[in-house]
């Protein structure tokens, strides 16, 4: 790295240049200034000391956005995005950014880094294998390893009808006492309690959907629940064309409740006027369920991690 390159914390005046560099480096996942502010800058855990930039003769030429959960007691951290301008690559700038950030995190007791899925504001569940092969090679050179390979999927809703097997599953579940239905206001507290117990990371997403569904404008969102004898055992939500999150109480899995929820949500999304459904993250095992409803793989990611010990 040349002597004119300086690594420092993010400053307010960097916004425009950082967004421009983000879009040049992470071209498959562009953002604008509004997304930068709403997702990251205004995140309660945002710390300029974990968002480092590199400048060359005063011009921004690299960045790495790291996040920790400020109120958490664990020792985890996340790399949400990073990049170096094409004209400054292979000069050690990326390594300097990461090394500086890792050193800062070690002093805070951080001992584990995941690349990608910082909740709630992750862009992708890892590094896109097709779009960013050089980034994967760089991370491997920095000591990161691939934990698993999640995929993103998409389905057309035009002409969608639930498969006969899903209809039969819904009928069987009803006979067993499990009912799938749209959420109503009386579900707010029970659903929040269900999420707190089974899917605490998704509570914020569900709360945001319920604020619109029951408090302002329901045109962009849907929410369905699965219940047995009045007890919520599963739920599924959508916002615009994005399906999920959704989940089922672990003790109720394997009975087809997830498939039944999916078969109810997709027609509801189409009724809202949306023509496709997509989501960012699932496993190959779960993808079998989605493929039965017309979903196809559109992206494949490397979920990478690194130990700082």
Locate each region found by the language model.
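Short amphipathic alpha-helix that is part of the acyltransferase structural core
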Residues: 1-39, 51-55, 60, 150, ...
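Active-site rim helix/loop that mediates acceptor-substrate recognition in acyltransferases
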Residues: 22, 26-57, 61-69, 197-223, ...
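A structural microfeature
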Residues: 62, 148-151, 234, 299
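Conserved hydrophobic beta-strand within the GNAT/NAT acetyltransferase core sheet
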Residues: 79, 113-115, 243, 277-281
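A short, internal acetyl-CoA/4′-phosphopantetheine-binding micro-motif in the GNAT/acyltransferase core
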Residues: 79-89, 118-121, 246-254
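Acyl-donor-binding surface of acyltransferase catalytic domains
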Residues: 90, 98-174, 302-306
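Conserved acetyl-CoA-binding loop-helix of GNAT-fold acetyltransferases
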Residues: 90-103, 254-267, 292
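Short hairpin/turn module used for nucleic-acid contact or packing/dimerization
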Residues: 254, 262-263, 267-309
């Amino acid at each position: 790295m040349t002597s004119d390159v300086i690594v420092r914390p993010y400053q307010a005046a960097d916004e425009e240049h950082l967004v421009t560099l983000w879009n040049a480096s992470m071209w498959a996942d562009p953002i604008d200034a509004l997304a930068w502010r709403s997702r990251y800058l205004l995140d309660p855990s945002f710390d300029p000391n974990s968002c480092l930039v590199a400048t060359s003769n005063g011009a921004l030429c690299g960045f790495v956005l790291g996040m920790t959960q400020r109120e958490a007691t664990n020792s985890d951290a996340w790399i949400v995005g990073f990049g170096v301008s094409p004209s400054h690559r292979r000069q050690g700038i990326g390594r300097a950014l990461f090394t500086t950030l890792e050193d800062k995190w070690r002093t805070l007791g951080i001992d584990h880094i995941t690349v990608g899925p910082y909740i709630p504001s992750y862009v992708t569940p890892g590094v896109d294998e097709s779009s960013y092969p050089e980034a994967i090679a760089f991370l491997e050179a920095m000591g990161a390893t691939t934990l698993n390979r999640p995929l993103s999927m998409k389905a057309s809703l035009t002409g969608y009808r639930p498969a006969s097997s899903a209809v039969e599953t819904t009928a069987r579940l009803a006979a067993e006492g499990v009912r799938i239905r749209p959420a109503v206001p009386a579900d707010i507290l029970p659903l929040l309690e269900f999420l707190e117990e089974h899917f605490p990371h998704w509570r914020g997403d569900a709360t945001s959907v319920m604020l619109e569904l029951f408090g302002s404008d329901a045109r962009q969102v849907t929410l369905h629940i699965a219940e047995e004898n009045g007890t919520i055992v599963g739920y599924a939500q959508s916002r615009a064309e994005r399906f999920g999150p959704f989940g089922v109480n672990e003790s109720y899995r394997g009975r087809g409740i997830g498939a039944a929820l999916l078969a109810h949500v997709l027609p509801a999304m189409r009724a809202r006027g949306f023509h496709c459904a997509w989501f960012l993250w699932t496993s190959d095992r779960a993808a079998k369920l989605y493929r039965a409803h017309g979903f196809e793989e559109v992206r494949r990611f490397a979920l990478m991690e690194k130990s700082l010990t």
